Regions:
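A glycine- and charged-residue-rich anion-binding loop/surface
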Residues: 1-223
Length: 223
């Protein structure tokens, strides 16, 4: 049996009324994508940064995911790119996601990761993504990593001493992020009267010109 806690946001009902509850299919699917991506992310972080990485907190919503982990310094741009590439590689492999309910001792023998200081019962649910990721977890997941579609890290920051935070998007959220970046990039090209091929050169030229003009202004002020 599974118990759910809900909140009435519209309408009303009374004790004794018979009601039918349904899950918001889209929110459930998007949440599952972000949750499964979090498992892939943790393993990718351990590959890139080292086995000292442990989960220190997590938030999964239909719109995004947030993952806190133990690490002693800010991640470099190269490290972030490597982690992102590994996660997307596992998504592209379309790995079946399997769940098993095992006795706690049998679950530990599989090598599945457990949350530090978390108390578990006699049986636990293990979520396996091929040989890449095995974790104790009771949450909702996709049935295949390919259903996540895509993964994009949008920020990496510190939240406490020795704890870093990654925020990321998957699926349609990642696609919308890329479209927004593309629009901003095109707007910059238009403002600079440049093309995507020469916009960096054009902006560098404009900056040099501004610097030169500012020097001339300062020179005139001193006369």
């Amino acid at each position: 049996r599974v118990g759910h806690v809900g909140k009435v946001t519209a309408g009303s009902f009374n004790v004794g009324d018979k009601v039918t509850l349904t899950v918001d299919e889209k929110k459930r699917i998007d949440t599952a994508k972000n949750h499964s991506a979090t498992h892939l992310l943790q393993e990718a972080l351990r590959i890139v940064l080292g086995n000292h990485v442990e989960q220190a907190g997590s938030l999964v919503t239909p719109d995004r995911l947030r993952f806190d982990f133990t690490h002693f310094q800010p991640m470099t741009e190269e490290e972030i790119e490597k982690v992102e590439a590994i996660v997307n590689e596992q998504i592209a492999k379309s790995i079946d996601v399997e769940t098993k309910v095992l006795a706690i001792e049998d679950a530990k023998k599989t090598g599945a990761k457990a949350l530090f200081n978390e108390k578990y019962g006699d049986t636990v649910r293990v979520v396996c993504m091929g040989d890449f990721s095995k974790e104790f977890c009771g949450g909702t997941h996709v049935s295949n990593t390919g259903l996540i579609n895509s993964f994009k890290i949008v920020s990496e920051s510190g939240v406490a001493a020795g704890v870093r935070r990654i925020e990321a998007l998957t699926g349609n959220g990642a696609f919308a992020y890329y479209k927004d970046i593309e629009k901003k990039y095109n707007d910059i090209c238009k403002a600079a009267k440049a093309t995507p091929a020469n916009v960096e050169e054009k902006i560098a030229h404009m900056q040099a010109e501004i610097k030169s003009l500012n020097s001339e202004i300062e020179s005139l002020k001193n006369k």
